[in-house]
Amino acid sequence: AGSDSYIAFSPIKGEENVLYVSLADFHQIWRVDVSKITPEDKDTYNGESYAGKAIYEGVMNGKGWEDGLLKNAKFRHPRQICFTDDGKMYIADSGNSCIRVIDTTMPKERAAVTTPIGLPGAEGYKDGGPEIAKFHFPCGVAVNSDGTIVYVADTQNKVIRKLSIE
């Protein structure tokens, strides 16, 4: 069994070896410290233990939409991830037709997933501010360094959308 996967390194000082992996078909985002991979386990390293450490976000195969603490949040086919310079992770949540955000500088127990852009599950095409814009299966997201401009690859609408965040 496989999954579409998308990866990005953390931009946070002191976390240069932390890699985030979005697993679309498993509806999760994992966190892996690549400095812990040794030559002996390079072919089998799965990250930290499954008991809440390797899995950074989302319930195992628990697809859906739910904002909130990392342990409770749900995704539906999260795809591309990217970061602002201050550690906010933007996620193209394709199946929910919205963009999600995690502040990765927060301790894992207090960090939360939010949906600042799009209307979860309300696919379509609508311009407007982040709270009214509609997308249809966005697969890509890019953000400028301070998080004020977000570009979204609105896949099923076949357009690149640009949003200004204030």
Predicted segments with their positions:
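Sequence signature of WD/YWTD-type beta-propeller architectures
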Residues: 5-8, 14-20, 32-34, 41-45, ...
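Short, glycine/acidic-enriched loop or turn micro-motifs at the edges of active sites
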Residues: 26, 36, 96, 106, ...
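Residue-level detector of Asp-centered blade-edge/turn motifs that repeat once per structural unit
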Residues: 9-16, 83-86, 143-147
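A short loop-to-beta-strand structural motif that recurs across blades of beta-propeller domains
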Residues: 27-31, 97-101, 158-162
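Gly/Pro-rich loop segments of beta-rich domains
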Residues: 1-5, 39-79, 107-139, 166
